[in-house]
Each structure stands twice: as structure tokens, then as C-alpha cells.
Curated annotation (Swiss-Prot):
Its cofactor is FMNH2. The gene is aroC. Belongs to the chorismate synthase family. This is Chorismate synthase. It comes from the Bacteria. This reaction introduces a second double bond into the aromatic ring system. It comes from Caldicellulosiruptor bescii (strain ATCC BAA-1888 / DSM 6725 / KCTC 15123 / Z-1320) (Anaerocellum thermophilum). GO terms for cellular component: cytosol. The keyword Amino-acid biosynthesis applies. It catalyses: 5-O-(1-carboxyvinyl)-3-phosphoshikimate = chorismate + phosphate. GO terms for biological process: amino acid biosynthetic process; aromatic amino acid family biosynthetic process; chorismate biosynthetic process. NADP(+) binds at residues 39, 45. Reduced FMN (FMNH(2)). The lineage of its organism: Bacteria, Bacillati, Bacillota, Bacillota incertae sedis, Caldicellulosiruptorales.
Amino acid sequence: MRFLDAGETHGKALIAIIEGFPAHVKIDIENINHLLQLRQRGYGRGKRMEIEKDRVKILSGVRNSFTTGAPITLMIENRDYENWRSFMDATQCDVDTKKVTVPRPGHADLAGCLKYEFDDARNVLERASARETAIRVAVGAVCEELLKMFGIKLYNHVVEIGRVRLTKSYSFDDTELFEQALSSSDLFCIDKEAEMKMKEEIDIAKQIGDSVGGIAEVICKNVPYGIGSHVHWDRKLDAQIAHSVMSIQSVKGVEIGMGFEAARRFGSEVHDEIYYDDKKGFYRKTNNAGGIEGGISNGMDIVVRAAFKPIPTLYKPLKSVDIRTFQPAEAAVERSDICAVPAGSIVMRAAIAYVLANALIERLGGDSAKTMLETFKRIYNKG
């Protein structure tokens, strides 16, 4: 399975085509729209979220709510396009009024202009914008519909904003806690006290014209053993997850399980001891590996965290240089968020769902979900 997406932040629409998705998967379009709505939420989001009300349109590959095995085409229209039509029309438009010649530090602006020989960063930022993640969330939501058939569920929450960390202890089995945070917390945080301090951190950044990043976590439940492989570098499940998550705008680090903390411990404190029970089979009492060993899922929860850097658009701009005159200038200011970590956790969830679905298709054979279920039952003695 693979997908390609296209579209600009102020273009007509965002499009994705998913190829190789199995037939006979029931698609509930409202589940997709629900995740799109969650992506738009979050304390610290910008004015753009007041304009866009993202809803997906399925243009192909699904009939009577079931996938057919044909390429699935998804589209999310950009409402803001009407305000930008005269600047973004594909045939003829005003390219001068919205021209951006002072790149923002931390954004793709300068590197993109140098690579593609542009004198206008608009041609870079329109595609590099995190607006693109809306369609990636839709793709991930479709993949979650497949994963649900095998009992696999994903949960996301925010564990850190700026200098404020979640201190409340929790278990990866606290799924109701994660679900409550999605429905009731502006930051998808399971700890109300920490959430209040996180909001204060965002408020401080807003007051001084700055931005703030953070860390999000995704827990994948009921992933069977044997997904991914050790035999080649590009088939390792953890490598694929890291690749997918690192491709999200603003992500600067990914860790699985204990992650970077493992580098500070002795091996005896890190590796999960193996036990066996006639009823449970092989099991562990700890999950420092985060559900993956040697690039293969081991049957434990897969736990992934990502570090999101602060958004590079600052309302108190940093120093930069005008690419036309080469003279010092303040960085360009585009409409932007102060903090997008909660939204980033939804995108992260989608990125991981895609990897898991693809690995599951490879493991079980992916032309038909019916055949996949039969193979799943045979391998894992389910049902």
C-alpha cells in the first residue's frame, strides 16, 4: 500500500490517493471527519481554524461504504481559497502582492528557494505548510478502519508543552483516560493541573510574540506479534514508524518505548525479561522496548513519542535576509498558530496508523480484508 497527496495551503483543495488498500473494509466517513475535527482543535491554534471546517469527500475506491480494492481518492476543500483565488489560480494570478522574499528561520523557505531557484518563498511555503497534514489525517483515519477489524486501536495524548511536563502517572491500559482527554481537554492532556500550566506556557509565548513546542505520545493497543521484519533495514517496523513520524512538519525527534532514556541505563534496567504461561503464552512484565524488538512487533503495546519544535512563524520576527537584496530584514510573518502540539498528536497517530496498516497488509496479504481475517485467525488462533 502507498499513498500520494497533493495541494497547497491556500490552494483549492488537498487530495490523496491510496493505492493497494484491501477490498471489503467498511469506511465510516464520520470517523474520518471526527479525526479531522480533532486536528483543528487545541489551545493555541490560529485564526485559520475559524475559517476551515474540514470534511472529507471520497471520490473513488469506496462504494456503499465499503472499499473495492481500487485506488481510494480523498479530497478536503480549502474554504480559504476564495480569499486567495486571485493569488493562487493555476492559470493566471497576481504573483507580486503576496510575494515572500524574507525567509523565516526554521521553515523550508530559504532551503526551498535555493533548491528550486525561486525568488518567491510563496512557492515553497504553500506546499511545506502543515495544512498538508489535514489530508494525511484522512489517510490515517481510513487505515484505522482496517486496523479496527483486527482489534488494533490507537490513542494519542500530549505529555509536554514547552517547559511544562505531565507528572501524573498513568498506565498504557488507561484507555478511558486517553479518550476523555480527547473529548474534554483543549490540549489532549490527561492531567487537568498540568493542562492549566501548559496553557499558561502558551499564553506567555503569545504575549511575547513567540511560539512553543512540546511532546506527544501515541499508544497502539492489540498489535499482534510478527508485524515488520528484521531481515532488511527498510522492513523494520520501528524504522518505518520513525520515518513516517519524522516526516510530519515540526517533528525533530522520535523515540519508541524507553527511547533516549535507555542510553542512560544499564542493560539489566532496560531489556524486558521474558516469561511463559500456559494460558498467556510468552509475556513481559515491563515494556521498555515499546512493543518492537529487532524491527518486529512482539505483541506488547507499541509506544511512540515525538518532539515537536516551536512553530517557525513568530509574531515578533527573528532576523533574516531579503533574498532579492541580500540586506538584513525581519522574517516574514504568515498567519500561524502559537502551539500546534495537540493537532500534531492527531497527525502523528495518522502517520503511525498508515505504517501499521501497511505492515499488516504485508503480513496477511492485502487484496481482500476477508482473506486477511482468515489468515489472521489461522496464525493467531483467533475466533
